[in-house]
């Protein structure tokens, strides 16, 4: 049963409403930020959607067998500032700040993915171009912090994509590519709307499907369109895309912007949708939008993390500042071996930034994740400061 959190001050009401075959990817991200900009990661290759409503899950048969295990890490919502009530922009990191430096070791893995809850542009306007209460934006210079943080890819499919109007939707994926990062779920004018982007790393082909069930503006003809769908339509619209991409990838990860803000629990229709996506071939479903942590649920050979909460965000009040880094380790046979949740929180000084949660703060983060996962029939093992899930079945759908 959903238990709504007490809404905090005004800020807690925040969001309302491809190409050719990839080249050799960059080496893993550096040990700490700031760091030199790594070599560009490969461009993602889209896989077109198919019209069938139901497609059997085929055996995966990649062209190149994986050379060993792979680790993927995921974080929640990231912004670099917002427009205040007087319509002036208030940045989060200062010009000399390195917002991901304190948590770089925790985030380090083969692939690092987050939700970029802000559009990007080359010339950030002094005044917001829209009239909403909560308006985000960032320049290319601000987005360079993502490179220092070791990110591989960022999802753009969320309900702040229109905060800088159509120009921000156009500039965002271009800027990410210029920085050597892979945009996921970017708004586009050409079909297919829902597509799997392929990232190759260390002999693995990992497919990412990013979609949003929330948006802050309707689509107008001739303008870029977000990969938007109602959660109730996920099975019909997304499951065929996943099933079609399954044979071309070692792993399929679904990154989804959904749910209710500040809710403790996912809604029943979210749970049904997530399980359908896993049944059709997804290995993980990773959610965001509620701005708070929600529970993790096992299903078959995979799992769903309903919300990873905020990560780099201005809201440092009570529950919304609790966050974490989710690490998934897959064996060479393409089976989920362990899922580890590293507790973290948003520190207020010297500027807002995520740090590992240890001691009393770590207990607070772990308690929330444990409590909210229990009704989902999930129990963790405590390993140091972290929560771990293991013993996932390895079925023929993912075995080599």
Regions found by a protein language model. Give the residues of each.
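C-terminal motif of bacterial Sec signal peptides marking the signal peptidase cleavage site
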Residues: 12-14
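Acidic, metal/ion-coordinating pockets
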Residues: 16-30, 34-400
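Sec-dependent signal peptide recognition
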Residues: 2-10
């Amino acid at each position: 049963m959903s238990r709504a959190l007490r809404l905090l001050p005004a800020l807690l009401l925040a969001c309302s409403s491809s190409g050719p075959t990839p080249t050799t990817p960059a080496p893993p991200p550096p040990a700490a930020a700031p760091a030199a900009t790594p070599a560009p990661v490969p461009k993602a290759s889209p896989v077109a959607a198919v019209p069938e409503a139901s497609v059997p899950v085929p055996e995966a048969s990649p062209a190149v067998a994986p050379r060993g295990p792979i680790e993927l890490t995921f974080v929640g919502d990231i912004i670099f500032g917002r427009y205040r009530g007087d319509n002036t922009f208030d940045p989060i990191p200062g010009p000399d700040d390195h917002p991901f430096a304190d948590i770089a070791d925790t985030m380090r893995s083969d692939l690092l993915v987050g939700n970029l809850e802000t559009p990007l542009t080359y010339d950030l306007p002094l005044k917001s171009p829209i009239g909403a209460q909560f308006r985000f934006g960032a320049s290319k210079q601000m987005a360079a912090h993502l490179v220092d943080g070791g990110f591989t890819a960022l999802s753009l499919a969320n309900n702040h994509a229109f905060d800088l109007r159509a120009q921000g939707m156009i500039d965002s994926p271009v800027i990410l590519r210029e920085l050597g990062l892979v945009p996921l779920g970017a708004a586009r004018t050409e079909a297919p709307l829902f597509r799997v982007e392929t990232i190759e790393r260390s002999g693995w082909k990992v497919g990412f499907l990013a979609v949003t069930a929330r948006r802050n503006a309707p689509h107008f003809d001739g303008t870029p369109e977000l990969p938007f769908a109602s959660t109730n339509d996920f099975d019909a619209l997304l499951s065929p895309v996943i099933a079609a991409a399954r044979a071309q990838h070692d792993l399929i990860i679904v990154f989804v912007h959904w749910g209710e803000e500040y809710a403790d629990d996912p809604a029943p229709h979210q749970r049904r949708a997530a399980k359908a996506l896993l049944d059709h071939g997804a290995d993980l479903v990773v959610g965001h939008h509620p701005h708070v942590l929600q529970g993790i649920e096992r299903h078959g050979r995979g799992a769903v993390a309903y919300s990873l909460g905020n990560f780099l965000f201005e809201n440092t009040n009570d529950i919304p500042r609790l966050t974490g880094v989710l690490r998934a380790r897959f064996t060479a046979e393409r089976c989920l071996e362990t899922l580890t949740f590293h507790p973290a929180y948003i520190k207020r000084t010297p500027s807002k930034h995520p740090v590992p949660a240890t001691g009393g703060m770590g207990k607070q983060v772990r308690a929330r994740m444990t409590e909210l996962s229990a009704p989902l029939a999930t129990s963790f093992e405590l390993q140091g400061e972290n929560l771990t899930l293991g013993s996932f079945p390895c079925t023929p759908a993912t075995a080599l």
